């Protein structure tokens, strides 16, 4: 299972992990030619964080991303 596939199981969550999962899903649908499903975890992290403009939100998203990675690695 890839990180993208794992995150697709989290899209219905109402927390930050669900938000990140929905952003990943939306990016993949908007840019199918980029083959985003194949991105590594650091590449996804960079892509999602590039969308965040304020430091407070960036910290929140970063914490959520790190939690999602820990959950994924625990599988």
For each feature predicted by the language model, list its residue ranges.
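Ankyrin repeat (ANK) tandem alpha-helical domains that serve as protein-protein interaction scaffolds
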Residues: 26-31, 46-75
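A Lys/Arg-rich helix-loop hairpin that forms a DNA/phosphate-binding surface
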Residues: 35-36, 40
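Weak global preference for isoleucine
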Residues: 16-20, 41, 48, 75
């Amino acid at each position: 299972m890839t990180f993208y596939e794992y995150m697709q199981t989290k899209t219905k969550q109402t927390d930050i992990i669900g938000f990140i999962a929905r952003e990943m899903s939306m990016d993949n649908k908007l840019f199918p030619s980029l083959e985003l499903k194949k991105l590594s975890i650091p590449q996804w992290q960079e892509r999602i964080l590039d969308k965040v403009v304020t430091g407070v939100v960036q910290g929140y998203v970063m914490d959520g991303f790190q939690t999602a990675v820990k959950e994924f690695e625990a599988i």
